[in-house]
Amino acid sequence: MNNTNLILENARDWHVVGLIVQGNPKKLSAIQTALLAIEHTEIPTLDEKLGKFVVVMQSNDQHLLLEKMESVKDIDGVINVSLVYHEQDEQNK
C-alpha cells in the first residue's frame, strides 16, 4: 500500500466537487491534459462545441481541494470555472 492510500484510508472525511470548466475551443486538448494531471481529478464528459468540461475532483483535505479548484483558473485557455456540486462524507471512527 502506498502513502496516498494510507493517507486516504486514515482520512476523517472526504470531499467531492463537481465543476463546469469553460475553455477556449481551440485549446481543449491542452486544457484536458492539464486537468487530468491534477491528482484525483476526472472528466466524465466534454462538450467540444461549447468548450465545456464536467470535472470531478476529490480530496480528503478541503484546503487542498480549494487549491486544486483555484489552480484550474490558471490553466491556459480556461475562461470560467463554476462550482456546481460539493459533498462532504464524514467518516465515523
Curated annotation (Swiss-Prot):
InterPro entries hit by this protein: Chaperone_NapD_NO3_reduct
Quaternary organization: Interacts with the cytoplasmic NapA precursor.
Protein name as annotated: Chaperone NapD
Main location: cytoplasm
UniProt-listed PANTHER family: CHAPERONE NAPD
Gene: napD
Intracellular or extracellular location(s): Cytoplasm
One record GO biological process: negative regulation of protein transport
HAMAP family per the UniProt record, alphabetical: NapD
GO molecular function per UniProt: signal sequence binding
Family: Belongs to the NapD family.
Physiological role: Chaperone for NapA, the catalytic subunit of the periplasmic nitrate reductase. It binds directly and specifically to the twin-arginine signal peptide of NapA, preventing premature interaction with the Tat translocase and premature export.
One matching Pfam family: NapD
Protein keywords: Chaperone, Cytoplasm
GO terms under cellular component: cytoplasm
